[in-house]
Regions:
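Amphipathic alpha-helical segments
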Residues: 40-55
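Vicinal oxygen chelate
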Residues: 2-33, 54-137, 141-153
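Conserved beta-strand-loop-alpha-helix junction that forms the acyl-donor binding cleft
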Residues: 38-41, 63
């Protein structure tokens, strides 16, 4: 296996990795939906709406299949939970840990979430990168992350 070289196209899209051996580049793939295992769909829906997630889609597909999608503010990636969705809903509630929500202003985000009744950890400063954590009612753990000023990830 050859090494990898990251090439950015001029359109500002994510980089494509190509092998030095000349393998075909893999087209862009967007992360659009992350499953969150919950024990009670309505309770989870209320929590995430309380946390400011929007763009709600709540569909009873069949008598046993319900799909709920919500999107964090400013994100193009949504979360999904529900019933009857096979391996997605077979995951253990509370087993997802460390999904990162990148924020521009940790203090403002914490203040807004606290005002909405969301409990957050104290802020951890890890070399200029700030973190604060919250969990949903099942224990799925979310990380708020703020990059240092001027950092371009």
């Amino acid at each position: 296996m050859g090494g990898a070289v990251e090439e950015k196209d001029g359109a500002g899209s994510s980089g494509r990795l190509e092998s030095l051996a000349g393998n075909t580049a893999v087209p862009d793939m967007r992360l659009e939906l992350v499953p969150i295992p919950v024990s009670d769909v309505d309770r989870a829906k209320a929590f995430y709406q309380q946390a400011g997630f929007g763009n709600l889609h709540d569909t009873q597909v069949t008598a046993t299949m319900r799909v709920v999608q919500l999107t964090p503010p400013g994100s193009s990636c949504a979360i999904v939970f529900g019933t009857g969705m096979g391996p997605i809903t077979d995951m253990t509630p509370g087993s997802v840990k460390g999904i990162h929500l990148v924020v521009a202003d940790m203090a403002a985000t914490r203040a807004a979430l606290t005002a909405r009744g969301i409990e957050l950890s104290d802020v951890d400063d890890m070399g200029g990168v700030l973190y604060s954590y919250f969990s949903d009612l099942d224990g799925n753990l979310w990380a708020l992350q703020q990059w240092p000023a001027g950092y371009q990830p």
